Amino acid sequence: MSESAKAAAQNGQAEEQQLQQQLDEQQQLEEQQQLPPVTIRIPSPTCSRTVPKPKDSTEPLDRITLYPQPQETIQDIKLLINDWVGAYWLGPYSLQLPFVKGEDGRGKIYSKKKDFSEVRAGEKLNEWLEVQDAFEHLQEGEERVLEAVREPYGELSARQSIIRLLELIAPSGTTANTTSNPLGLQAGSTIFEQVRDGLVSANAETTYEEVEVSLPSGRKGKGGKKELVKVKRSVSGDKAHAFADWKGWAPASFGSLAVSSDPVEVAPSLKSIQISHFNPPPPHLRQKGHELYLQVSLLEGEVVTLICSTRGWYVSKSNVNNFDPSPRPSADGSIPAPTHSLIDLLHSISPLFSERVSRLPPISLDGALADPISTVAIPQATPAYPFLTSPPKPAISPEILRTQLAFLHTGAYGPDLVDAARDWNEEIQGIRELPRGTMQERVFREKMLQKVWAEFDQAAARAVQAVSKGDIPPINPAEDPKAHMYLQSNIFITQGDSDALDTYAHLGGDAAMRISHGKDAAGVKLLNKIDADGLYLLGHTIVDWQGRRWICQSILPGIFSNRRAVEEEKAQAETEAEAETADAVEGEQKKEDWVDVEKPTEKSGSETESDNPMMIYGLDSERPTSVHWDAATHSLLSTIATPLRLAAHTIKDGEGKEHEFYASAEVKGLKGQDGRRYLLDAQRLAPVDVEWLEKDITGPLVGPKKDDESAEEGVQYPHRLVMLRPELIEQFWESELKRWARGVAEKAQAKKAEAEAEAAAAADAEGEKKKEGEQSEIPQEEQSAAASAAAARRAEEDRPVDASLIGDIKQFNLSFNPDAFVEQPVLEAEGQEGKTEIKAAITDESDPSVKAVRDAGLFLRQIAIPAVVLDVLTGNTSGVMDGESLSKHLHQRGVNIRYLGHLASTIIQFSTSKDGAAKEPSGHLAALQSIVLQEMVFRAAKHILRELLYPLQPETATDAVSHFLNCLLGSCLNPAPVASYTPIGINSNEPEPAYVKLTPECLRAQIIKEVKSRFRWTLDESFLESGLRKKQLLRELASRVGFQLAQREYVFSKDQEEEENKREENIKSKEKKKGSKAGAKGETVKRTTTFEGEDVLTLVPVIKSTAPSVSVAEEILEAGRNTINRGKIEFGLDFMLEAIQLYESIHSVIHPEVASVYNSYAQAIHQIARLKIQQIAAQENPDPEQPLGVDISGALRFQRQAVAIAERTLGVYHHETAGYYFQLAMLENLEGNAQQSLRYFRHLLTLWDVIYGPGHPEISTILSNAGIVLQSMNDLSLSLSLQKQAYESTLACFGPNHIQTGQSLHQLVQGHFLAGDMASALETAKQALEIFKARLGEEHNQTKEEAKNVELLTAVIENQERQKEREEAVKKEATERLKMARERIGGGAASTSRPTGIRRLGGAGAGALPQGVRVVDPQTLAALAAAAGQGGNPSANAAAATAGQGEQANGESTGTPQIGERGTESLEELVRYIQGSAPGVGGSAKRGKNALRGKRRTGAKR
């Protein structure tokens, strides 16, 4: 059974088929409605320079042909026109059908719409009109033409023209863009293009190479002098690959780490532009059509004032000091007419403007300055802010228009003209009420919802900053400051970490309040995902900034009303007669219908007692005995009960009356004055973790304890608001469903006839076999009792079930009571006034829904947590690199972060030996343990830092952060750092903040205490001193707490300080040698601490949105995956591409969800391609050129975009970005782009170093894959080096006998084999074989494969040995024959005198022989050559060829070649002579070497 459970066995496939049918119908509809092209006629500009001449002279610039899609509107067409080079300059215009005179003298009427609008020829088309509706009157085949017609200006269109001009001359991501005002520095930066182009090396330092350049000597008549100079040159593929300088693992330097790309250099097109100070136009000039005055400083040095009238723009006679609205005459004295387009006018008055603008998109014919995905603004996602950055230089660029942007967008000159802020609530709820019956309606609705949620999040962050600084007064100034509420930009803002009203005093006070708001936001996000019709939720966002948590919500209509809602009472009286039909309100959508509700009479208290008359459902938190109930709201809540697995249960009010609820009674329903029903306080949509309440609030610690720590076991958990995660509820539900299905199947099998008993037994045996096979996945050396038990449970749960025996799946029923074990304050008996008792009202576990809550808590401890560790142990979990990735993984598995201590304890249990002896974790478990412990420290430190920052002013916060970091991370360098604090000085009694007194010892004690309290774990103090990965913890603190550090190398220890000092000394010495003036600037002051206040540049708000994922695209994406899993690959990929288009349409491309779906598609293509490669390789006669049939190039394009988007929205050094880079590197290698693949692998190693550091097992995988890529490039030496490093890393992580070590050795065998080192390959293969035999058994496929490798390598080496023996035998035989020949010749050769002349073979003269020369027969010479040549020495073979040539040179041969009497002293010398190394011959070795090299080819030819 799949993880989606057999619950989908009957209806899941039907739903998928229904979705597929819906998509097919939509596709058929689109094919039927494929629109013919539409030609847009564009007017001509007044200036000839406005539109550049195209490279292709046949391309017209007065018209553009577009191919609209169905449902595209006139507004969509205008957006396309605005980006075209021939129409970028247009001012306000409308699209019209060509004029045809009608009967009434106006344009001819072509059609009338239901909304009474008309489509007339020659009149402006409604921008929301669909394009196809504009041409309903045309027959098929007729030309479709629209005309862009200039429209008169208003103030709005004048301001829009200026904004359009700014977008043109100051594109996003360029140096010209100086008007942006982000929340942090270098928002949304990316380095992907640098990595792609090889501009980022391992340490991000610029690579230099020496080249010769000609420098002028200054002398007349003489050429320049060539001198070696250093020139910056990027490492690119035409010189060397990314690993060419790889020497091994080297930690990345923070000081030179690549964190962002420099903005594209763009020359300014105008000196300045600003709204003229003569604005607004006076009444008499406004009456003449004046709309706006604009002051522009041209590059030519002239400052002009442009006046916008209803007819267009013109240059006035005004100057900076005097206003004259008269048009400035032309050079010939004539008065020019206004120019309709502002951009066209600037072209006509400034040639330099035309020149500069022609280099910018969309006018430039050379393409974009940079990849748009790296530079365009991020519309619907929070940009990532790098944790390291450099302040801009200069700190701020002068830009007057930056202060006038508010006017450009609002048109308000004063507070009386400011438009009311956006009504966020009405926008959100209005979009919710849009129709969603068809796929197109759903897409449009979700697109609008995602857009408004993103804009709400950004507005909330801005509002929180204003509130936190004290710029916004509270709306309840008389109350406790912790209870202050604020209203800014129509956003209701409250503090989320103070329980000022003691609402959660019984659950933990402020700590419980903070958790409650986090759970509330999660509940709102979950309900937004469910999107139940008729249930409304406020816009909701959490913003954490400078130690405080702020809750931002849209305003509930009527929440600030102080009078009784007389209208509601009247409406209630009118609908009392219709109370019996109130249930029908469930499916209605009109607001008027929401009035038809039952009279909420079932309350414990009267309406006069209620402080909130809007509340109609749920438990009143201010009056615990008051319960509100409303039938219509209850009916609506039943729609969310099924997806959330909620059980119907009853709650008693103060009068003992019972009311039925689905969600917790603490989830409140309020009826706004707009008639809508809203849900608030959604924190209790999941049940309570009763196991934690009973065992871990004050229970014993699960971590290792010292002998003297028995008293510490009672450390109190900070709060009692502990709940299970919805993911765990779903997992437990699926697990119970499988167990129920197995029980039903077993009962059905038991009832079968005896004839089927044998078949049933065989099926059981097969199941047991699978169970044993799955258990064997764990290496035997790691089969601790805990691991074996977890594996057995996993195998039992995955045991297949015969679905035909189950019957109706609806018989299974499991739901949870969210009010079970919920603690509430209860007043005690009389006589004990003021005293309350905290107890739960629902605890009867005989109720299945209550017992299910208990069982779910046990499932979390006994099944879910061990399953997490088991998957890590067996290698089924990857990508857990840091605390953030760990938290995300645990949440997906339903494990709360408070269980980190239990998770660490489980790791220790899984690491014990088979006999139960304690053993240090290794491999993946060791890495997981390191991440878990560091995450405990991080979260404890975050809570402490938050408390320190809470009361501080912004200017003091940076000093507090730097001192905190010194105490946490810099104590090895300076054990007693002194805090920097400068009082504001306004109040003489100003108290000293708490951070000033913080010391490293105090901080370590607080962290240990926090870890004990929050995670039930005893943290060893030595871990804080030597176990922390400090650079990685610094990155996480900056990224997740929200602050940016100055980019520099931070020194954490004395040893590192010494290394930095040596490096600086080397730099200074080099500068002195070069005569650099750097030393004249003075010595830099030596730091005494790791961090200083100036290092903390800014604190960035952390936004937690409640916007859910896109459900309509998610459904199609999941359908695509399921289709691929069923073997229909082509249809599945089509589904995934359809989902990608929807994600792009809804999220506007640059969004983390779009990056995720890009990666999913590329990963699917990669897996399919690998599978097809295996299938081709398994064929009898495989064709390596056979196409795979998948679009790898398209997948590469998506994956590259995914990386860039992830860097901009998640972070350059984020765990998901690293995963995308790995997938990209693998795809590049699959496509054959080895150079690119190596660049990404090299950068991936840098990412791992920054995120985790060295020593993680997954780093070995990267090194191994890079080595395989190098093998394809024939760089076998470096490939072998990387394979060895991968093996050494694996050996260090897992030990010598681990299965992973065997796998690494198996990879290393191939490296040795390709390098030609057969002996090492054989030895490595034998080591791998021993590991596989011990861990997998001799019958395992991998063991058999390795045994074959050993057998083949042994055969190769034996063959080499036999060849060597044969060569030795031939050489020995030749030596014997030579000896016999010498004996036959006589004793002349026995002379011991050294020759004085030059030895040579052959005769001198025409057959005449010198005196005393003896003859050697040809057989002897051949034997001599064999003795030197059979050994495989190429020099000897060449010498034999030389001897043969010498004989031919003598002309006639005697037939008995002779050797002189003193020709040699011994056999060895003779052999050496033939090999060209005879002693006593001057320069013979050198000459022989060169001569043999040259005659080697001649001999080969002969």
UniProtKB/Swiss-Prot annotation:
SUPFAM superfamilies tied to this protein: Hypothetical protein c14orf129, hspc210 (SSF103107), TPR-like (SSF48452)
A molecular function GO annotation: mRNA binding
GO cellular component terms, semicolon-separated: cytoplasm
Transmembrane segments: none
Bias-annotated ranges (Basic and acidic residues): 53-62, 587-606, 1054-1069, 1462-1471
Biased composition (Low complexity): 7-35, 781-792, 1429-1451
InterPro entries reported for this sequence: CLU-central (IPR033646), CLU_dom (IPR025697), CLU_prot (IPR027523), GSKIP_dom_sf (IPR023231), TPR-like_helical_dom_sf (IPR011990)
Domain of life: Eukaryota
Biased composition (Acidic residues): 575-586
Residue ranges of the region described as Disordered: 1-62, 571-615, 755-799, 1054-1085, 1381-1403, 1429-1502
Keyword set, alphabetical order: Cytoplasm
HAMAP family attached to this UniProt entry: CLU
Quaternary organization: May associate with the eukaryotic translation initiation factor 3 (eIF-3) complex.
Family of this protein: Belongs to the CLU family.
PANTHER family: CLUSTERED MITOCHONDRIA PROTEIN HOMOLOG, EUKARYOTIC TRANSLATION INITIATION FACTOR 3 SUBUNIT EIF-3
Function, as annotated: mRNA-binding protein involved in proper cytoplasmic distribution of mitochondria.
Protein name, per record: Clustered mitochondria protein homolog
Organism whose genome encodes this protein: Cryptococcus neoformans var. neoformans serotype D (strain JEC21 / ATCC MYA-565) (Filobasidiella neoformans)
Upper taxonomic lineage: Eukaryota, Fungi, Dikarya, Basidiomycota, Agaricomycotina
